[in-house]
Amino acid sequence: MISVWIRVLGALLLASVAQAQFQFFEQMFGGGHQEHHQQGSQNSASDSSRYQQLWEATNCNKYLCPGTLACVDFPHHCPCEHPNVEDKVELGEGSAVCISKGGYKPGEAARKIELARKGLL
């Protein structure tokens, strides 16, 4: 009798976990009933024509950063595209990368890159 109850409880537990997962994915991916509140507006075109127009209209006699269209003296002086969530790390060879800010301390992302370059990470 106890083994029957254990099987029933196990089946109920599995069913509830499966239902919770399906609800998560349904909510995560829209579940087929997405609401659109865009009154008459459309998404931007998926080609690069708008970017090309901005590129061609930008005046710069130095280096034009491809991601931000900032005019700078050297490529490694280009600002990050999303400075609120990215840290810029200069690699020392005249190049730089923008990486997601990580952790809780300022400069932690740069520290991790330096450790990786030294083979310690």
UniProtKB/Swiss-Prot annotation:
| Keyword match Secreted | no
Q: Which InterPro entries match?
A: LCL2
Assigned keywords, A-Z: Signal
Biological process GO annotation list? Answer: ERAD pathway
Signal peptide as annotated in the record: 1-20
Protein family membership: Belongs to the LCL2 family.
Q: Give the protein's function.
A: Probable component of the endoplasmic reticulum-associated degradation (ERAD) pathway.
* Protein's name according to its UniProt entry: Long chronological lifespan protein 2
Which species? Aspergillus clavatus (strain ATCC 1007 / CBS 513.65 / DSM 816 / NCTC 3887 / NRRL 1 / QM 1276 / 107)
Task: Kindly list the organism's lineage.
Answer: Eukaryota, Fungi, Dikarya, Ascomycota, Pezizomycotina
